[in-house]
Amino acid sequence: MEVKDANAALLSNYEVFQLLTDLKEQRKESGKNKHSSGQQNLNTITYETLKYISKTPCKHQSPEIVREFLTAMKSHKLTKAEKLQLLNHRPVTAVEIQLMVEESEERLTEEQIEALLHTVTSILPAGPEAEQQQNASDDVAMDEEDPA
């Protein structure tokens, strides 16, 4: 097998999640579960990938959210790969942005990094672990206020 164009398209984690979920549903509906070693390997890869991706923020994204995010990112001077990393990982700190944006110290001011963070956190939904952390911190705050 030969790769003709390695960078024909970049896929977000959301797109991979949707593709694999649809593929899994199609196989389930058609009832085709061949037990060849190649099919078993594909099933394993699909399962492991879906298991991993379902723990990331992309599980809570939609085509509208992705479109809105990419439209909002046009004002920022970032490469496609950098936008994709921001979309996939949903950074919440300046350090995370600096890790994802190449040469961020030279390319971005602190205000631009804060603007990026605001764009990311306001458009992209938080993952389940972020919601759990928020709920836990809310519970702690309520306990401190009401020591009944």
From Swiss-Prot:
Q: Pfam families this protein is in?
A: RNA_pol_Rpb4 (PF03874)
The UniProt entry's GO biological process terms, in alphabetical order, are: defense response to virus; innate immune response; transcription by RNA polymerase III; transcription initiation at RNA polymerase III promoter
Quote a single Gene Ontology cellular component term: DNA polymerase III complex
Which InterPro entries does this chain map to?
A: HRDC-like_sf, RNA_pol_Rpb4/RPC9_core, Rpb4/RPC9, Rpb4/RPC9_sf, RPC9
Q: How does it sit in the membrane?
A: Peripheral membrane protein
Any one Gene Ontology MF annotation carried by this entry is:
nucleotide binding
SMART domains under this entry?
RPOL4c (SM00657)
Q: What is this protein called?
A: DNA-directed RNA polymerase III subunit RPC9
Q: Which family does it belong to?
A: Belongs to the eukaryotic RPC9 RNA polymerase subunit family.
Looking up SUPFAM superfamilies in the UniProt record yields: HRDC-like (SSF47819)
How it assembles, according to the record, is:
Component of the RNA polymerase III complex consisting of 17 subunits: a ten-subunit horseshoe-shaped catalytic core composed of POLR3A/RPC1, POLR3B/RPC2, POLR1C/RPAC1, POLR1D/RPAC2, POLR3K/RPC10, POLR2E/RPABC1, POLR2F/RPABC2, POLR2H/RPABC3, POLR2K/RPABC4 and POLR2L/RPABC5; a mobile stalk composed of two subunits POLR3H/RPC8 and CRCP/RPC9, protruding from the core and functioning primarily in transcription initiation; and additional subunits homologous to general transcription factors of the RNA polymerase II machinery, POLR3C/RPC3-POLR3F/RPC6-POLR3G/RPC7 heterotrimer required for transcription initiation and POLR3D/RPC4-POLR3E/RPC5 heterodimer involved in both transcription initiation and termination.
Location of region: Disordered: 125-148
